[in-house]
Amino acid sequence: MDYGKAASEKLGARIRGGAIITKYGHSGGPIRGIEIYEAGHPLPDSETLRATERILGITGSLEAGRMVLFLVSGGGSSLFEKPLPGLSLQSLTEITSALLLGGADISELNTVRKHLSSVKGGRFALHCMPTEIFQIT
């Protein structure tokens, strides 16, 4: 949320729209021009999918010359998620839960996630083409 507030304050009217996904109970109030969604963390849930679909909708119709500012802070890898076709949310959640219970660290978890996700491993950047995308983590 702090990233989003800072970006909104610094960029002002240059921001034409956007969305933030945060953990339940962490929205911290409205940000001008930005939609705020709360979703499951560390396990993705139906709100995770809804929020991710909204971001894909916003970014999927941008023309060349536009820019996507993609800000990711702690927890972002579970909050921005859409399973690959053929993989259910339930299966993804079960896999994630098993990894967490098995003691996987965040690097190991994210390595597996990128192979199961429609938005990780460069897939979100491809989705955003032909726009420029700037990611800050």
Regions found by a protein language model. Give the residues of each.
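N-terminal loops that bind phosphate or other acidic moieties
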Residues: 1-137
